[in-house]
């Protein structure tokens, strides 16, 4: 709502931090977890949702630059566990994505900070479910009190438990009762952004 009504004015910068835990139990749970060919890496498997958010809110990118790191150095992981990505959006905004699956013990943070000419807003928490700060010209910060559960897989916890809402939308669309929330074109754009980010990865 804040973005669609342009309450922030021109968007100058957006920063997304995703610091998660994916331990040995996760990678040994399946033969595709950790495989460069089958898994693709954390931007496809864990953090595509956040790139989707960036695309949904701010549109396409002109270019991306990135650095990748392997802090855990696990022999069963064929790609990075962490990275820093700079995005140049077509609307001239600058984006930064910091991500890691090498966080100790549990998911630590999923946040987005948006800096605009008329204000700033930060949404965060473990599952990007809390307004941490909102300072916008002539605007009162909304209250969000919803508690969001996570997907618990036993040996590790996943993202926020929202998959049921997407599945329900698919069912309702097939029954001709609702409009689709998203389409494959949007999904392809997100894949292209990730491929652009990964183009510098060996």
Question: Where are the regions that the model predicts?
Answer:
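Predominantly a Rossmann-like dinucleotide-binding segment in NAD(P)-dependent oxidoreductases
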Residues: 1-76
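C-terminal helix-rich "cap/oligomerization" subdomain common to oxidoreductases
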Residues: 90, 165-202
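Residue-level signal for the nucleotide or nucleotide-sugar donor/cofactor binding architecture
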Residues: 45, 109, 182
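Short beta-strand scaffold segments in enzyme catalytic cores
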Residues: 85-87
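NAD(P)-dinucleotide binding in Rossmann-like oxidoreductases
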Residues: 74-79, 91-165
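Hydrophobic alpha-helical segments typical of transmembrane helices
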Residues: 49-53, 162, 166-170
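Active-site rim elements
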Residues: 40-41, 153-158, 176-180
């Amino acid at each position: 709502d804040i973005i669609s009504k342009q309450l922030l004015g021109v968007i100058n910068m957006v920063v997304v931090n995703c610091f998660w835990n994916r331990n040995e139990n996760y990678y040994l749970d399946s033969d595709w977890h950790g495989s460069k060919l089958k898994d693709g890496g954390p931007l496809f498997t864990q953090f595509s949702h956040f790139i989707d958010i960036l695309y949904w809110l701010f549109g396409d990118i002109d270019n991306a630059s990135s650095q990748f790191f392997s802090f855990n150095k696990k022999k069963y992981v064929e790609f990075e566990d962490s990275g820093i990505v700079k995005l140049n959006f077509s609307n001239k905004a600058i984006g930064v994505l910091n991500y890691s699956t090498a966080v100790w013990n549990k998911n630590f943070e999923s946040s987005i900070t948006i800096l605009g000419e008329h204000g700033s807003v930060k949404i965060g928490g473990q599952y990007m479910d809390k307004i941490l700060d909102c300072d916008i010209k002539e605007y009162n910060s909304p209250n969000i009190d919803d508690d969001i559960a996570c997907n618990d897989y036993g040996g590790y916890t996943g993202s926020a438990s929202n998959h049921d809402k997407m599945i329900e939308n698919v069912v309702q669309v097939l029954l001709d009762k609702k409009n689709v929330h998203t389409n494959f074109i949007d999904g392809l754009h997100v894949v292209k952004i990730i491929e652009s980010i990964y183009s510098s990865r060996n």
